[in-house]
């Protein structure tokens, strides 16, 4: 399913697990069309068919940009690169080597996801190294002469996370940096997985995006939303709230996951059960608790003390 959501921007529902409105890719059209996010490998056949339905032939796609290399965002990149042989693949420098040789990434994912890896996500096929371009802060990717996407380094969710600024439409493609905002759910929900989550970096990244005064945020999970600055502020408050609850639990010797469930899962009580299950499949309390717990532990070790108020 595709939808033009702004001038020259097409939202493509990549349907992770066959679910609608859970994972999105975005095609920015022009003389050199650019695909942002591929979704998982399990979504690749659908994505390829949708691109072809939009008139994108194998020789047309100029670039693929990945906000980060988690499998729900990048798992299909090897398949897309194979079908669209002229497309360059843009990624954070720390992610480039994993696209060329994904063996370590797949091994790690196997330990995290277990049987869900193959049933829900699929794997990640290698991308030819000569087609991978490492993106730095401020680099641009041309769409049409005089029009481009600009890369912002936005670590926090993952250390190798980047976002993309499309000034003509005021759209910031934010990946998972701001969290998850599914249409059927409505509320913003954090995404703080291990091993890289870092509160200070995450909030700095949201400020960096806010400095561009975007009118819209385009989430990988899911869709393009107005009132971008308000959502960015909400995202900062949300991350700080979750981290404060987790820190208090750690100081009190309580299970962080239990404390977070008690504090925030009641916010989901009025949701349709299917919508709630989709949200928690994408960004469950268990994974978020693991990420925050790891961050708190690393911060304590760095500071040489048990705790300090969350930023």
Language-model segments: which ranges?
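Active-site metal-binding loops of divalent metal-dependent hydrolases
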Residues: 38-40, 69, 94-95, 157-158, ...
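Metallo-beta-lactamase
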Residues: 60-72, 99-152, 206
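C-terminal regulatory/interaction regions
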Residues: 245-311
């Amino acid at each position: 399913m595709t939808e033009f959501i702004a001038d020259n921007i097409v939202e493509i529902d990549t349907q992770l697990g066959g679910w609608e409105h859970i994972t999105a890719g975005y095609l920015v059209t022009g003389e050199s069309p650019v695909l942002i996010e591929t979704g998982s490998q399990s979504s690749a056949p659908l994505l390829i068919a949708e691109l072809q339905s939009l008139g994108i032939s194998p020789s047309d796609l100029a670039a693929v940009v990945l906000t980060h290399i988690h499998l729900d965002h990048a798992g299909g990149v090897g398949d897309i690169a194979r079908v669209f042989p002229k497309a360059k693949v843009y990624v954070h420098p720390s992610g480039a080597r994993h696209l060329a040789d994904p063996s370590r990434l797949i091994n790690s994912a196997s330990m995290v996801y277990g049987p869900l890896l193959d049933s829900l996500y699929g794997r990640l096929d290698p991308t030819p190294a000569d087609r991978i371009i490492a993106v730095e802060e401020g680099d641009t990717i041309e769409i049409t002469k005089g029009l481009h996407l600009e890369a912002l380094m936005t670590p926090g969710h993952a250390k190798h996370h980047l976002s993309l600024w499309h000034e003509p439409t005021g759209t910031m493609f934010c990946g998972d940096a701001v969290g998850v905002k599914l249409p059927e759910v409505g509320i913003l929900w954090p995404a703080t997985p291990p091993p890289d989550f870092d509160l200070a970096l995450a909030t700095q990244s949201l400020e960096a995006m806010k400095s561009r005064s975007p009118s819209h945020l385009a989430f990988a999970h899911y869709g393009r939303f107005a009132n971008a600055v308000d959502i960015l502020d909400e995202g900062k408050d949300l991350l700080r709230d979750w981290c404060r609850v987790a820190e208090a639990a750690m100081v009190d010797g309580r299970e962080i996951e239990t404390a977070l469930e008690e504090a925030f899962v009641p916010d989901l009580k009025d949701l349709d059960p299917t919508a709630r299950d989709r949200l928690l499949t994408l960004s469950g309390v268990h994974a978020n608790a693991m990420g925050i717990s790891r961050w708190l532990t690393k911060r304590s070790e760095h500071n040489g003390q048990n705790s300090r108020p969350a930023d």
